[in-house]
A protein has these predicted regions:
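Long, low-complexity, intrinsically disordered segments
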Residues: 301-318
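Membrane helix-loop-helix hairpins that form the core translocation module of multi-pass transporters
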Residues: 111-120
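A glycine-rich beta-to-alpha transition motif near the start of alpha/beta enzyme domains, typified by
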Residues: 1-112, 138, 143-278
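Acidic, proline-/serine-/threonine-rich low-complexity intrinsically disordered repeat tracts
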Residues: 272, 276-302
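Active-site glycine-rich loop that binds ribose-phosphate moieties when present
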Residues: 119-135, 154-162
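Residue-level marker of intrinsically disordered, low-complexity segments enriched
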Residues: 125-127, 269, 279-280, 295-296, ...
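A structural signal for alpha-helix termini and helix-coil/disorder junctions
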Residues: 38-42, 165, 284, 291, ...
Length: 318
């Protein structure tokens, strides 16, 4: 099945992200991502799906697995800011997967920079992996385990086994952190797509690292700035006070390509699988609705006078 759509590529600190600007049924997102990497751009690490508006700025952006991605969000925010007549920094609110409500992105279209505001951690917990204690920073949409030590892929698998079992989330990061050099190596696993990548950079992992270093973000002043080295470059983090309080903002430069029309060819067996899964979901939903309908208690106020009279005669109501 051949599908055509508008497409552009973003490079937020090496975390190469492809964007499909078209409505895409969620069941096809994994297939689109695989085909884009194989047929259009082998350097793409992840794909975001933008729901365009009839005119003006787009409506929202969803990642393939429904997770939250800070780098993709700030790239999407910069793209969205291009629809507004702005000069200099602008704070725009965007809707993205993995986060309830809006997310603030501070964008500078002229200088091609964007920073995403991150909510405070939902929790900080101590997790035991292979006899060692590590700090888990739980952010909305993704949880990051901070590991002060050298990169170790075997440890990543051990950690994910513990995290997936005991800490349910949409995505997990294992962040190897060199505290002296302020340098991280991020591994990210996405539950919805069952994918694990050694990321070129990770915005949420960078913020999780700062939350690991700093106990109280509210206690930091707005002069606070720090740069964390990622495999493909540095990400900047600073404190900014929004209407709902202080937040850490992470980002830097973002390269955006021109929007072009692209096509992919989705294998027929994949199409058949998606259709079968869709039909299964529809049938399960119909069954659920039927069961809910049977469980409903009849409320006389919902009946017409004629129906009420029949009920009274049939069951002897006064």
């Amino acid at each position: 099945m051949k599908k055509s759509f508008k497409y552009f590529r973003a490079n937020p600190c090496g975390n190469i992200t492809g964007f499909v600007v078209a409505p895409v049924y969620p069941g096809y997102r994994k297939a689109y991502t695989k085909c884009i990497i194989e047929q259009i751009d082998k350097d793409v690490e992840q794909v975001g799906f933008i729901s365009p508006a009839y005119e003006g700025a787009p409506l929202r952006m969803d990642m393939m697995g429904g997770e939250f991605c800070a780098n993709a969000t700030r790239a999407y925010g910069l793209y969205s800011a291009g629809f507004y007549d702005t000069d200099g920094l602008v704070d725009i609110e965007v809707y993205v997967s993995g986060h309830e409500g809006t997310t603030d992105v501070i964008a500078d279209v002229k200088n091609q920079k964007a920073y995403v505001a991150m909510d405070a951690p939902l929790a900080k917990k101590t997790v035991k992996v292979k006899g060692g204690d590590y700090k888990l920073i739980q952010l909305p949409g993704i949880s990051h385990l901070i590991v002060e030590g050298q990169e170790d892929e075997k440890f990543v698998q051990d950690a994910l086994e513990v995290l997936k079992k005991d800490y349910k989330d949409e995505a997990y990061g294992v962040i190897f952190f060199d505290k002296e050099k302020l340098e991280i190596v991020p591994f990210v696993y996405v539950e919805g797509s069952d994918t694990l990548f050694r990321e070129s950079s990770c915005g949420s992992g960078t913020v999780a690292t700062v939350n690991y270093l700093e106990d109280d973000i509210d206690g930091l002043d707005e002069d606070y700035k720090i740069s964390i080295k990622n495999p493909a470059g540095e990400l900047e983090v600073f404190v900014y006070e929004f209407e709902d309080g202080k937040k850490l903002c992470v980002g830097g430069e973002v390269e955006l390509s021109e929007v072009e029309k692209k096509s992919i060819d989705i294998p027929q067996d994949v199409v058949a699988s998606v259709i079968a899964e869709h039909d299964k979901i529809v049938e399960e939903r119909k069954k659920q609705m039927a069961e809910e309908e049977q469980e409903k208690v009849v409320d006389e106020s919902d009946l017409t006078d004629e129906e009420l009279e029949i009920m009274r005669k049939k069951f002897g109501f006064d």
